[in-house]
């Protein structure tokens, strides 16, 4: 049994995740040892959890466009890790999905990150990921954090969620696709080459 398999077993047997495990729901993340780019988001949505495949929706199509990669590279190259702040769908709230459960990322991310020694860039998708990884260096709102993305390179790059629901935000912030996405595609191409 590999170290990652031991971690997965520990996640599934953890009392915090017992209800999911009893209902046959496995933790949803990807952590290939060869990963060079780590994508940290909030948590799987209900459709994602049911489909058992992360970023396999309209948001994922847009994310791969932003990265400048195809599905084959994204899912099967071993160069992308997907490590949400919670590996399970946290449930529905009044205005959307509930936030990731407290303490989940703190408990499991450090163990899993040790298993991926080649990660060169971590993409922080959305405010929860940015607050968790950037801490006090994150700005008061997502727009300011994303706008100052160069301050966090080369280790981190904050992104707005690629959801079609963010179309208005993208229209209000043309610099995102004009500058940040151009830089992101260059960085990703450099990391993936060879």
Each model region followed by its residue ranges:
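Active-site and ligand/interface coordination hotspots across diverse enzymes
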Residues: 1-59, 189-194
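Glycine/proline-rich loop-helix segments at beta-alpha junctions forming the active-site rim
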Residues: 2-9, 13-21, 86-194
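Short amphipathic alpha-helices and their capping/turn segments at secondary-structure boundaries
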Residues: 24-33, 61-74, 113-114, 148-150
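Conserved beta-strand scaffold positions in the cores of enzyme catalytic domains, especially
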Residues: 39, 80-82, 156-158
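Residue-level marker of positions within ordered structural domains that often coincide
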Residues: 45, 68, 161-164
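Short, electropositive, low-hydrophobicity segments enriched in small/polar residues
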Residues: 45, 49, 64, 130
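Short, surface-exposed acidic-centric catalytic microdomains
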Residues: 53-100
């Amino acid at each position: 049994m590999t170290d990652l398999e031991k971690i997965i077993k520990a996640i599934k047997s953890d009392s915090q995740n017992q209800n999911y495990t009893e209902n046959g729901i496995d933790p949803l993340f990807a952590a290939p040892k060869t990963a060079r780019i780590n994508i940290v988001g909030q948590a799987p949505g209900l459709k994602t959890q049911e489909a058992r495949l992360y970023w396999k929706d309209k948001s994922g199509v847009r994310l791969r466009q932003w990265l400048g990669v195809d599905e084959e590279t994204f899912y099967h190259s071993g160069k992308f890790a997907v490590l949400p702040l919670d590996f399970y769908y946290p449930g529905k709230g009044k205005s959307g999905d509930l936030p990731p459960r407290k303490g989940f990322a703190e408990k499991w991310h450090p163990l899993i990150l040790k298993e991926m020694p080649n990660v060169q860039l971590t993409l922080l998708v959305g405010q929860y990921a940015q607050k968790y990884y950037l801490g006090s260096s994150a700005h008061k709102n997502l727009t300011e954090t994303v706008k100052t993305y160069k301050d966090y390179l080369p280790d981190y790059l904050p992104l707005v969620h690629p959801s079609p629901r963010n179309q208005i935000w993208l229209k209000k912030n043309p610099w995102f696709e004009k500058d940040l996405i151009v830089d992101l595609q260059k960085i990703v191409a450099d990391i993936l080459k060879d």
